[in-house]
A protein has these predicted regions:
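Structured alpha-helical
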Residues: 1-110
Length: 110
């Protein structure tokens, strides 16, 4: 299996706990919001998401209940979210987050 397929499978495993989240694919930049970790960031793909929740894979050392920022790859205002679940699958890590201030409008865009 390829690395991309492995990442998608990891996200799919976590999405089983969020059956109402549709599959989606768009690029974001994930940034740690923890003081002293501001330089920790990476680009990734949101694989599942709608309204208040999103699921993506990451190599960042994120933990349960940690605050992060998501920035749409094409720009825009960062959105703060909280890690609510982690899934490890064959060396990969998927993260589910809940947006701190309601829904994330980008997810509603086609």
């Amino acid at each position: 299996m390829s690395l991309i397929a492995d990442e998608r499978e990891c996200a799919k495993q976590l999405a089983k706990f969020f059956p109402d989240l549709p599959a989606t694919r768009f690029l974001v930049r994930v940034q740690s919001a923890r003081p002293g970790r501001e330089k920790l960031q990476e680009s990734t793909v949101v694989e599942f998401g709608m309204g208040q929740f999103a699921i993506f894979t990451t190599s960042l050392p994120l933990e349960f209940d940690e605050r992060i920022r998501l920035v749409q790859h094409s720009g825009g205002k960062p959105v703060e979210a909280e890690v609510i679940a982690l899934q490890y699958h064959e060396g990969m890590k998927a993260v589910a987050v809940r947006f701190v201030e309601g829904t994330w409008d980008w997810i509603m865009q086609p």
